[in-house]
Amino acid sequence: MQTTFTELMQQLFLKLGLNHQVNENDVYTFEVDGHIQVLIACYHQQWVQLFSELGADLPTNDNLFGEHWPAHVQGRLDGKPILWSQQSLVGLDIDEMQAWLERFIDDIEQRKESQNTKFQPNSTSPILFI
């Protein structure tokens, strides 16, 4: 028997012990370490989708496929940079959902970290201007 999106989310949050909110459109929201907000939704009861705002200071990335499967795509929504990903609900179990969510959160953290260190010169290494 196929697990519904609602059942999958209930199992996930119970397993992870995370506090979450769900709105009237069945969009689940939770925070990671107080600085990353992740939204999880299901499109037409077929596609599970993950979303997170990246922050205004991150440049747009045109790498549509990325390093992960399912792909994590950086784009814009309402003028703000976001990271999103989706995969079919069919066959998605709790362990796969947890692993996907963990990779997604790791990707967000790496993108934010690389942006924070991108323009901070290391005082111990010389800067070469060409």
UniProtKB/Swiss-Prot annotation:
Name the keywords, alphabetized: Chaperone, Plasmid
A biological process (GO) of this protein is: protein secretion by the type III secretion system
Subunit and partners: Binds to YopT.
Its annotated function is as follows: Functions as a specific chaperone for YopT.
Write the protein's name. Answer: Chaperone protein SycT
